[in-house]
Regions:
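Solvent-exposed, positively charged interaction surfaces of folded domains
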Residues: 1-192
Length: 192
């Protein structure tokens, strides 16, 4: 009976290894107003490692001292860049670091989806939980309570683990966030 089921599964399903994503970096504090094309052209012209690289702009966002840009690139360019401390752009030396593109829901605080696609029945309508203290009824920016991570608390209850919970759900000290980063790294193409 089991062999028949296995045969049926083989005929109806295909097993595929997920494709790996290109590594991303975030370049900090770009003060010049650049079009996407000017940005890429300047990176290529002033960074020998990027001359022939496959570069793709993911997004940019305002920061305290300009704009931060997130770009993806092929593993060869990424591995060459990570040996450096700075990247050149418009005759400035700017700092950068790897960016993991962590997706976290601002309703339930879980990873892998956004608030818009949250399936948690508890948060379908109305607001979610505070990412700082895990309580309902207010947002993180309004919170003055002691931090308590909803993800580590849930993991401890579900699996009997003893993760510390005295941090926000967005903290770099969060063990669940570390696991999410490890998962992203496992799906990234860093080359052979």
């Amino acid at each position: 009976m089991e062999l028949e089921n296995l045969k049926e599964v083989k005929e109806n399903f295909q097993i595929m290894k997920p494709s790996l994503k290109d590594p991303n970096i975030v370049i900090f504090n770009i003060t010049d107003e650049l079009s996407n094309e000017e940005f890429i052209d300047s990176l290529r012209a002033q960074n020998e490692d990027l001359t022939n690289a496959t570069l793709k702009i993911r997004t940019s966002y305002k920061s305290k001292f300009g704009k931060n840009w997130i770009i993806s690139m092929d593993h060869v360019a990424f591995n060459a860049l990570k040996k450096r401390k700075n990247i050149n752009l418009n005759w400035q030396m700017l700092s950068f670091k790897e960016n993991f593109r962590i997706i976290q829901c601002f309703k339930c605080a879980n990873y892998g989806h956004t608030a818009m696609t949250c399936r948690d029945e508890e948060f379908k309508t109305g607001g979610g939980i505070c990412l700082r203290c895990a309580d309902k009824g207010h947002r993180e920016r309004e919170c003055h309570a002691d931090p308590k991570c909803s993800n580590c608390t849930s993991h401890n209850l579900k699996f009997g683990s003893t993760f510390k919970t005295d941090h926000s759900a967005r903290s770099n000290d969060c063990k669940i966030r570390e696991k999410e980063i490890d998962f992203i790294i496992s799906r990234t193409n860093y080359g052979p």
